[in-house]
């Protein structure tokens, strides 16, 4: 959807940061918006990555990645560091373990942000326009990380303006407009045969801009 259509708000609703007005949100078949649900416990099942990298500038890459597992989940320091090093190596950042964020490129910082979210071993990953703050040449770095997560079977909800990426990676695509899910379905349906006039208009503008 276009800017202001409600993509970020939807992700915040899934993460229980914004209350929903009606309906329900199911995670593993359980309604996480039901009365009495512990929001903090639900959030422990999710990882979320925003547009801004939000790394702690006074901490090394290793400390950024291990902070939540240690402080929130009670993982022993040695175990958390072993897991962090494994993740960093898997995403080509093993040589950045002791670096501080200001020594990293934007693409590297965003990859560390993704790894930090993965370090808590979430059931669900939420991505909110994670490439929008990156130079175009760095976008592929982060998109390749998300592709790798898909190949590993990670469940993800992604808000993105990278239409070609969404078409290639998604199992289901939702088009949002003015705070509503106007249309949803498999990528082939949404991108090749959308039923709503607003969806068609949006996609045509993307095509005209050479972004699809």
Predicted regions and their residues:
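ABC family nucleotide-binding domain
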Residues: 1-178, 182-187
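C-terminal boundary and immediately downstream tail of ABC-type ATPase nucleotide-binding domains
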Residues: 184, 188-212
